[in-house]
Amino acid sequence: MVKISVSRFGSKHNPHYRIVVTDVRRKRDGAYIEKIGYYDPRKTTPDWLKVDVERARYWLSVGAQPTDTARRLLRQAGVFRQEAREGA
């Protein structure tokens, strides 16, 4: 099974996260299939959250399950907005 999750990188006391598509059997910071975005929790830049919405929707359409944190970030990026309108 494939999941969409966050993978930590950056330095000590300065976390940054990649939003990645990975196999559920991989470690949090292990190898991933595709990087679809990034997140800066300290909001040090104007683009503190960036997600490739098209690729995120693709992976969701083929069955990737987002983790709770990834789901929250994808929702903030607007990944679920268009899907809700199309289904209505």
UniProtKB/Swiss-Prot annotation:
Instruction: Determine the domain of life of the protein's source.
Output: Bacteria
Family matches, as InterPro entries = Ribosomal_bS16, Ribosomal_bS16_dom_sf
Keyword tags? Ribonucleoprotein, Ribosomal protein
According to the UniProt entry, its GO molecular function terms are: structural constituent of ribosome
Family matches, as SUPFAM superfamilies: Ribosomal protein S16
Please name the GO terms of the biological process aspect recorded for this protein, alphabetically: translation
List the GO cellular component terms.
cytoplasm; small ribosomal subunit
Q: Which family does it belong to?
A: Belongs to the bacterial ribosomal protein bS16 family.
Q: What is this protein called?
A: Small ribosomal subunit protein bS16
The species this protein was found in: Thermus aquaticus
